[in-house]
Amino acid sequence: MIGVRVVIALVMLLSAACTPSEAQPFTPVDLSDTSPVETSSRVPARPSPQDSARSAAPREEKVGVAPGVRVVVEWPAAPDADTTAMIEVLRDYFAGAFRAVVSEGRDTGYLDVVEYDAVDDASSWVGAFLDERRSVRGTARLYALNVSAVSGSGDDRGAQLDVCVDESKMRLLDSSTGKPVARQPDWTRKPFLQSAAMGRAADGGWRIRLFRHAKLPDERAKGCLR
């Protein structure tokens, strides 16, 4: 789902988040209960390796897009309120963009979470699928979500949200037949790093203003290998 683009410098991303350039897409852990312990001189039980592994594991959120299409988000363990809001925006964008593709452009909800140049970028991405009579099926996975930088404060605050995207479980389809095309694109094989510059909209909510990505063998994208 991605073409060959170059990730711009961080300063440019942050400045774009605070003021109004090329889009490319292509989603707290529960601790196990313990038995009550008397509050006398007992030493608190030490967590088992299994408990530690569970507490370190990301929480998965599965978002249904359409029959046979979904976005899975691996949430960080304890995001603050702003990080949570930004992740929700990026999740809604990915799910919404795929929903626009499978609905043949009828669903335009993805445009609710973008502004400035990101509007044209997102519209062009969806339009390319429609023009070529292409659709998708499968699962896109978003992981290693991280706010890598912030600038400004209050209503003027901007931020860069990085996310690793794995679409290897997706297939590009011929929308007229519903069957996978013979030549599958690179994004169905290798993960890539997506960066979204975000800023506060007039209603106080976060919006995506700029997209950039890094694809393998770029050093930044290597962090998405696992």
Summary of predicted features, one role per range:
Residues 105-223:
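Structured, amphipathic secondary-structure segments that form assembly/contact surfaces
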Residues 59-140:
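Core segments of small alpha/beta cavity-forming domains
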